[in-house]
Structures are given as structure tokens and as C-alpha cells.
Amino acid sequence: MSSPPPYLTVRLIGGTNMFEEFYCLKHTPFSRDIPTEHLYRSSMLEEILGRLEYAARRQLFAVVTGDCGTGKTTTIRSFKNSLNNSRYMVMYLADSKLTPRHFYKGLLEQLGCEAKFYRGDAKRQLHREIELMQGIHHLQPVVILDEAHLLDKEMLEEVRFLLNFRMDSKSPMALILVVLMPI
């Protein structure tokens, strides 16, 4: 068996961080897991974070839109990290095939609860948990649905019904949908 041609050979010299060492960098640039405190805080990012914080404070519905790769999810990470943990409970779901049952299950699990099996029971359970969270713990729930452009009609209807609380007189949570702009 012959050895591969030399142009297919990869040699790592100096370990996996040779790039950082060569350019005297503290961190790998443009990595997906960049800490949000290291993000460049442009005026546009500050405005988006301000609007999202307003939506969280007022328990509103918000939609974050943008093209693929423009930093929607990174912005959401920055937003989540900017919120006061003693005032807000952030729940995040990203599932292209999210069903209403799995939606409630995912949120209730993030609250430390085992979800009821039936969708209606799980919805009522979530409303009770939110009332306890707000009344006893004084936490405002913030639900973030990433990749929401992939949700089907049934799931979008369920989200709409979830926000109808106390005969539509109160929003039980801030809801933020993160969607890809149509191509």
C-alpha cells in the first residue's frame, strides 16, 4: 500500500493552539463558543439587546429575524447573559420538529418538573408553575424559541394559545421567536 501524496499530509506543530501562539492571541477568533462579554458591542447590538430587555421586562412577544449566519443565536446568548438571574428565568428551546407536547415537556423540564403526558394537562401544569414562579419566587419567565421559522402551523397555534392567559388580559411570559429571513 502506498503512502498518501504529500499534499494530503497534515502536520500539527506546537500543539492545537499554534495559531493562537503565532499571532499572540488569547482566544481563537470567531469561535462559536466565544464568551458574550468578548463580543463587540456595536450600537446595533446594544439596540437589539435593549429591545429584548424591554420585551422581557413587559412580558411581551418579540421576533428576532436575520439572514443565516448574522448572529441571531449569538445575540440571544448575549441577551440571556445580560439578564438578572434573580429577576428572570430564561427557558430556551431549539427544535425544528417541536410538537406542542414536547414544547411543554421541554419548558417544564427546564423548570425542574416532570411534565404531564397529555398536552392539555401539561399546558395547565406550565401555567401553574409560571404563576408560582411569578408569585412566590418573583421571577419573570422568558421563553426563547430558536429556529422558529421551522415550526409547523399546529405549534405556532399552540404558542398563540399559550399567550392567551386570564381571558387575554395578561401575558404569562415574554416570548421571543428567533427566525431565519426567507431566502
Task: Give the label of every model feature segment.
Residues 2-58:
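A short, basic N-terminal segment
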Residues 20, 99-102, 114-158, 166-171:
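Mid-core helix/loop region of P-loop NTP-binding domains shared across ATPases and GTPases
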Residues 28, 88-90, 98-117:
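Conserved NTP-binding/hydrolysis module of P-loop NTPases
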Residues 58-78:
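Walker A/P-loop nucleotide-binding motif
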Residues 65, 94, 145:
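Residues at the beta-strand->loop junction immediately N-terminal to the Walker
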Residues 70, 147-153, 161, 182-183:
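Residues immediately C-terminal
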Residues 74-88:
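Walker A/P-loop
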Residues 167-183:
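Canonical AAA+ ATPase core
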